[in-house]
């Protein structure tokens, strides 16, 4: 039996062709392929996008880099593609220019991924400076021959300043006070006075406050070297409602070049005047009936709580398990791209969350983490954190959701990254170990059976929903072996019901 499992594990590794990945490195000057005459060359890219990402380089210090992603055009010339070269030029006080070459580890055997999606890759690099215009251009290799038009794709990208939610973590910005939140409030006390409140910065000891419209209406300096809420009254020369309050800090790290913050002057809320004695008596007479009604309501509520408590004590011995709060079970769900996410995966997720108290992990909900960690690292981390891994397989019978999900370009199904083949290849080595095999479950939607490249999953426990719903729930609750989990298993078994 062990020999059969080993053969199955070995066969599942070679069942699917290896998908190309990228290996990137710096390349200065023309690519070597440019010096060679080519009969045929690959076409240009289909799409090129740029966004900012924050990466940690030391304790409380971050580097801001470009996350450049591109989509390959789905045509026959993709079989000739060897690499993609990306060049970035920046224009500011100092011009910059650098290039990277990303080689594809495998030759492309198809115009699209085996799952049906377009080939998409991304590279994180190229440090980003503040308020700089960048030109990002990319072309495929081998590129066009000399004296021929070279297909390429370019985009412009202007990096924001220190108040951007990503750029504010850049060291230059943090030293200028980008992470400081002064929480400025300003209100018009009267025609001649504005009250400004703000939280000081412990790195500074001096602040300048300007109240401006078309001209400066008021001015004040504040000296404070401790973290505290400060209030200052500033005389103004004319109407101040709607005027701009500009707060300039002078911090040790940035001196006279710190980030200025702004607020707006609004009307101060009116304070209540003392109520005359006659009005006090009148108000007391109006509130007395309401007070009596509230007193009766509180008494009724207390009596109800007492009766409920007594009834709970009398039934506690008869139904001890039903009152237990079941701990959550972490379940990683992987599914092929042909499954309709909204009609099938979401309903299956609701089934796990609502009836068996499961904490569900889906790649659809963690795209940002996948982009930061990479799909292999993300799958490995989630497998270790999960109590169970569920392979969700579709039915052979077409459902109505197919028309709703759609296969047209730009649909959610096309844009979603298919991690099912990668998860299958990554986890299938566990199928030969009885120690790890208990962690994996196969769930069919309808009457389908395993076929094709995923026959290695046949060694895992298999369930058809909703026919095997009860057995599926029981298997889920075997994540731990403690006595409390056995009690929870019975409670979940009694409370679970079909979708």
From Swiss-Prot:
Residue ranges that the UniProt entry lists as topological domain Extracellular: 18-286
GO biological process: positive regulation of inflammatory response; positive regulation of interleukin-13 production; positive regulation of interleukin-5 production
Ranges of the Cytoplasmic topological domain: 308-499
Domain SEFIR, first and last residues per copy: 328-474
InterPro entries given in the database record: IL-17_rcpt-like (IPR039465), IL17R_fnIII_D1 (IPR032356), IL17RA/B_FnIII-like_1_sf (IPR038683), IL17RA/B_FnIII-like_2_sf (IPR043046), SEFIR_dom (IPR013568)
Keyword presence, Nucleus: no
Tissue and organ distribution: Liver and testis. Expressed at lower level in kidney and lung. Expressed in selected T-cell, B-cell and myeloid cell lines.
Molecular function in Gene Ontology: cytokine receptor activity; interleukin-17 receptor activity
Keyword list, A-Z: Cell membrane, Glycoprotein, Membrane, Receptor, Secreted, Signal, Transmembrane, Transmembrane helix
Signal peptide per UniProt: 1-17
Parts of the chain that traverse the membrane: 287-307
Coiled coil: none
Glycan attachment points: 67, 103, 156, 197
GO CC annotation: cell surface; cytoplasm; extracellular region; intracellular membrane-bounded organelle; plasma membrane
Subunit-structure text: Interacts with DAZAP2. Interacts with TRAF3IP2.
Job of this protein: Receptor for the pro-inflammatory cytokines IL17B and IL17E. May play a role in controlling the growth and/or differentiation of hematopoietic cells.
Misc. comment: Evi27 is a common site of retroviral integration in Bxh2 murine myeloid leukemias, localized near the Il17rb gene. Proviral integrations result in increased expression of Il17rb on the cell surface.
Protein name: Interleukin-17 receptor B
Organism: Mus musculus
